[in-house]
Amino acid sequence: MDQAASPDDHARYLALRAEVARHNRAYYEQDAPEISDDEYDALARALRDMEARHPEWVEDDSPVQTIGGAPSAAFEPVAHLTPMTSLDNVFDADELREWQEKLARSLNLPPESDDFTFTGEIKIDGLSVNLYYLDGTLQWAATRGNGRVGEMVTAQVLTIPGIPQHLDGLKGQLEVRGEVYLSRADFAAFNAQAEELGTPLLKNPRNGAAGALRQKDPEVTRTRNLKAIFYSLGRRDGVEARTQSEVLQWLAGRGFPVSHYSETFRGYVAAADYHRRMTEARSNFEFDADGTVIKLDPLALQEEAGFTSRAPRWAIAFKFPVEQVETVLESITVNVGRTGKLAPLAHLAPRLIEGSTVSKATLHNEDYIRQMDLRVGDTVVVRKSGGVIPQIMRVVTEKRPEKTTPFVFPTYCPECGHEVTRAEGDANTYCPNPACPAQRFERIRYFVSRGAMDVRGIGEKLVIQVIETGLVRDAADLYLLTAEQLAGLERGGEKKAQNVLAQLEASKTRPLWRLINALGMTHVGERNAQALARAFGSLDALLRATPEQIEAVPGMGKVTAVSVSAALADPTMRNLIERLRAAGMSPEETQTVRGEQLAGLNFVITGSLSQPRDELKALLEAAGARVTGSVTRKTSYLIAGQDAGSKLDRARELAVPVLDEAALGTLLHQRGVQLPGVQASAASTV
């Protein structure tokens, strides 16, 4: 460790590294970012600065030295021919100039050289994909994944308009890279329909695109109206292009959708002007974008400049500034969710931000309101967090009207009047009354939603009607409804009633993960429900599972495992499940295939191996293992290659079994796992 660094400095580094890694997983693997892009950029920049000052702290799995996230075990992993890298960022013209000067030094060129011709492109906020062609025929399409290994999504990508399946006259291997996105218009239309049906809303267009592309059923993907823009080539046999601008022309000539906002210019001053003009125009884009990308135009110079461990030296992302506006906080309401959580909501004087009208913003919890000292009548500064979700940044106290008073958080449920509770150490306040009409409504609405049991025809209005008339108290009562009862409701009718009953009947044999999600357990959404279904295969097996067995499922932490176990053991939950079964609920059981053989095992990889570490990590995770960066008492095995270093010492200190590649092959063979490049051997440990 550097002598100038104190133990506290190193502790702060480890904490920051863990925080950035957590946000990477939320963004790349769970499609659920918790902070805005600019907040993430600030954290990542701080971590890079610390690693630049203390290179002895840096390990291979540093979250700012690696790319993307682990491929999902739900899709077949596929290795890219050439890595799909990330991009480094700049935030103003001075930083752009410094980047050009650094690039000039790496190429042994003067900073003002005429060779510095750049192509500017829009940085679309979507999901990166790679299309692989062999002799002109599309073989597969994959997500970026960790940059080396992605998820096979060929059938899903082929639902996107404008994807050529054949390229006449082309020989050899070709990789075409682009961005899949959900347009702002389709995002708004989806959420408008979801709101009408009472189903979950998409958080932002990027999440919508990622979720649609990762649908197992391509026909579901097709309904989301995804689009794509293509902008680069990886392997490019037979493509005669000398510059990035010629690559874009070649792509357009072959029928690939390309951006109409690309320009070619000379030097960083012109690049900064391009960025300024695109910043002003971004509200007119049909897609969300978080910046521009400035690329060195000559491909020969790109190859000469090369790459760092995570990004090309010849390209940079120039991030858009975050647009902020002032508006007035007109009122604060408190809603009650399906778990009983009280959710405060700010109602704002409508303002236009980045092309859409903002009139509401979440206020999270009581502490958030108190810390910001938010008062009705205040002038507040609002932005779109991550470009989409409205967020109050601060109060303009100098504009505060006289006689305003602090907001008083309710001590009784605004829906049922029951006294609310707040556990020590918990930021959230809850209504503990299970009969609370708001909770009942939200639980039933969630149960029938698109992401749960997907009962079409039961929207928000019908849920309100069946609750208010006393026909339904919980989800199981839905399956006891009769045609006469439904037809007798306002705006009912025989035809509508029969349609609802048919949809309810069809839902009885939905896949197991849908029922798990529909039960509405805390910490369980679509992704965790699918993981639980894959791991346990049947509802009975899940009901018998211990917290330790649940925690062993990839993606589950201890908090989630304890929460799920407690929820499933609750007498009210058990009664609901039994009543659903009595009504004929028989979910389709899930085959426990890949993703279970190594469940419960925690691996750490270190040293030089015969295959890329990222590929081995992805393949182990696809078989159900968890791969982490540090050796602890919870580590099942350390996989050690040449020059293993301090992790090997730590494993021996903790008596963690150590495997070389041959011993790993033996373990995998015994578990029924075949991983390419890993052969079984009689060897056991090193």
From Swiss-Prot:
NAD(+) binds at D37, D38, E39, Y40, D41, S86, L87, E121, R144, E179, K295, K319. Its cofactor is Mg(2+); Mn(2+). GO terms for cellular component: cytosol. It comes from the Bacteria. GO terms for biological process: DNA repair; DNA replication. Belongs to the NAD-dependent DNA ligase family. LigA subfamily. One of its GO terms (molecular function) is DNA ligase (NAD+) activity. It catalyses: NAD(+) + (deoxyribonucleotide)n-3'-hydroxyl + 5'-phospho-(deoxyribonucleotide)m = (deoxyribonucleotide)n+m + AMP + beta-nicotinamide D-nucleotide. Its EC number is 6.5.1.2. It is an enzyme of class 6 (ligase). DNA ligase that catalyzes the formation of phosphodiester linkages between 5'-phosphoryl and 3'-hydroxyl groups in double-stranded DNA using NAD as a coenzyme and as the energy source for the reaction. It is essential for DNA replication and repair of damaged DNA. The gene is ligA2. Zn(2+) binds at C413, C416, C431, C436. Keywords: DNA damage, DNA repair, DNA replication, Ligase, Magnesium, Manganese, Metal-binding, NAD, Zinc. Residues 593-681 form the BRCT domain. The active site is at K123. It comes from Deinococcus deserti (strain DSM 17065 / CIP 109153 / LMG 22923 / VCD115). The keyword DNA damage applies. This is DNA ligase 2.
